[in-house]
Structures are given as structure tokens and as C-alpha cells.
A protein has these predicted regions:
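Generic structural signal for well-ordered, non-membrane alpha-helical segments
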Residues: 54-58, 94-98, 138, 142, ...
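Anaerobic metallocofactor- and corrinoid-dependent redox/one-carbon enzyme cores
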Residues: 49-67, 72-76, 92, 98-99, ...
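Small-residue-rich
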Residues: 60-61, 68-182, 187-190
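Acidic/polar, glycine-rich intrinsically disordered N-terminal extensions of enzymes
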Residues: 1-86, 90, 94, 114-122
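Structural signal for hydrophobic packing residues in well-ordered secondary-structure cores
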Residues: 36, 105-112, 146-160, 206-221, ...
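Generic detector of well-ordered alpha-helical segments enriched in charged/polar residues
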Residues: 18, 26-33, 44, 59, ...
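Glycine-rich anion/phosphate-binding loop at the beta-strand->alpha-helix junction
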Residues: 196-197, 202-272
């Protein structure tokens, strides 16, 4: 088993904290604060419970509020990502999730931890215009007015543009409706959402440019909505685990490795 001396267990900001699960809640908070993983303000929020959602605030967030619903807040330990320690906050109601994550992170840590690449943050908004005439020509008209479309979309979210994000490109496709053969021109609005989840922002932009799309295509816009296929917003991470570190509970490292390979083979062959 690889040594843990590369990442001192008692070093500042180390996420490897032995026997953390045996501590009381107040001891856990104090230990994370001592290691610099919680700020003094974090500690105050946790101890005072000021972090919990107030019913009056909840009533302004959604409709027909009756109260708030609490769930446990815990942290997964042992995460080493790009040579930096992290504790991962988790709000879950099911036992073993936090322990399982922490255990997997410890195994990964022994081999050097996880490595992640910069995350692509493009979401796609779709604006569907039903048109008469040559759909390919209508598509070209949209492409010719790309800058006007992007300027209008970005005017709706200037703060996102100030953070380096916003709508930065369009793509245009045309299809025939299967039922009656009607021509559809579908514009994809590509939006860099930076650190925001961005769904509402993309929907707002699609709504905002719909009238302009109708004017350009001389068509009728129906759907104007965020795409559920997020193939431009992809997080990539990798980890290498020495076979010896997989050994345990009566299984050799080789047998665990081979079982993981078989499970992956099934996942590739069967989408269920």
C-alpha cells in the first residue's frame, strides 16, 4: 500500500483527517476550522444555524410555500484534486454515501489523487421556427444576422457578459416535420454560463431573441428553450490507482481490477 507521507495528515488544509467520523459535530467543525478548511464566518453560520433557510425567504423563492425541509449536511474527506486538498460538502439523506465517497477518495489519494481538466461551460438554447419556402435559405439568413442576434441576447444579461460569459455563437439546422413535412429552422444559441448553472439565463435569452428570429426567417417561432443535451458542458477527470491499492476484504488487487473492467464492459454494451 502506498505511503501517505507525501501529503502530511496534519498539514494545513489536508483533507485526510483520521477518525473524523468519531468526533462530535462541534469537534468536526473546530477541526476543519483549525486546518483552514472553514472560515470563521463558516463556523459562525454552522454553529448559529443562520445557514438554514428561513420560511419568509422560501416564500419568495417558489409558490405555495408551507415551510422548509431540512436534510443532513456532511463532508466527504480525502479528496486530492490537481494536487490540492478539498473537503466536499454533501446534503444527502441516505447513509453510506459520504463514507463511500471518502473511502474511494482515500484510495485515489494513495495514487496521487484526481486530475481534472478545465470544464467546458457552453449550454445550448434552441429556437424553433416553422417556415414556408426554402428552409436552407432561411438558415443562411439567420447566420448572416449572427451578430445582431448575439448582441440582443447578451443585452439581456450584461452581468454575465461582464464576467466573460454570455452568448458567443449560433448554429442553424433545418429539418422536416415527420407528420406533415413542414419545414423547421432550428437555431442553437451557444451560451457560456461561466460558473452559473445557467438554465434560466439561456431560456431568457431564447425568449428574448425569438421575435428577431421570426422577423429574419419570416416564420413562426414555437419552442424557445434550453436543450437537455449538454454535450458542450462536459467535466473531465482522471485517476490512476495502483493495483496493489485495490486489495482488501479478502480480494486481491488483480481480482478487483478485473471486476471493474467487467463492469465497464457491461456499461459500454448495455445502456441500462
Amino acid at each position: 500500500m502506498a505511503s501517505e507521507s507525501l501529503h502530511n495528515l496534519d498539514s494545513p488544509k489536508s483533507s485526510r483527517i483520521p477518525n473524523f467520523f468519531k468526533m462530535s459535530i462541534s469537534e468536526r467543525i473546530s477541526e476543519l476550522h483549525r486546518r483552514g478548511l472553514l472560515t470563521s464566518d463558516d463556523v459562525h453560520q454552522l454553529v448559529s444555524r443562520d445557514h438554514q433557510l428561513d420560511s419568509a425567504v422560501a416564500d419568495k423563492m417558489i409558490e405555495n410555500v408551507l415551510g422548509v425541509f431540512g436534510l443532513p449536511l456532511g463532508v466527504a474527506l480525502n479528496f486530492l484534486i490537481n494536487n490540492r486538498d478539498y473537503v466536499i460538502p454533501l446534503v444527502v439523506e441516505e447513509p453510506s454515501i459520504v463514507a463511500g465517497l471518502s473511502g474511494a477518495a482515500r484510495i485515489a489519494r494513495l495514487g496521487g489523487g484526481f486530475y481534472s481538466d478545465p470544464v467546458d461551460t457552453l449550454l445550448i438554447g434552441q429556437v424553433q421556427s416553422v417556415v414556408d419556402g426554402d428552409a436552407s435559405k432561411k438558415a443562411q439568413l439567420l447566420l448572416a444576422e449572427k451578430q445582431e442576434i448575439l448582441s440582443l441576447a447578451n443585452s439581456l444579461h450584461p452581468k454575465m457578459v461582464a464576467r466573460g460569459g454570455g452568448a458567443n455563437d449560433i448554429e442553424v439546422f433545418h429539418h422536416k416535420a415527420e407528420e406533415d413535412g413542414r419545414e423547421m429552422v432550428v437555431m442553437h444559441l451557444l451560451v457560456d454560463t461561466r460558473d452559473a448553472m445557467g438554465a434560466n439565463m439561456v431560456n431568457t435569452m431564447c425568449e428574448g431573441v425569438a421575435g428577431l428570429v421570426e422577423k429574419i426567417t419570416n416564420g413562426k417561432v414555437f419552442l424557445r428553450i434550453l436543450s437537455n443535451l449538454t454535450d458542450r458542458a462536459i467535466a473531465r477527470a482522471r485517476v490512476r490507482i495502483p493495483v496493489a491499492n485495490l486489495e482488501g476484504k479478502g480480494f486481491t488487487g488483480q481480482s478487483v481490477r478485473d471486476g471493474i473492467v467487467l463492469a465497464n464492459d457491461l456499461a459500454l454494451a448495455d445502456p441500462y
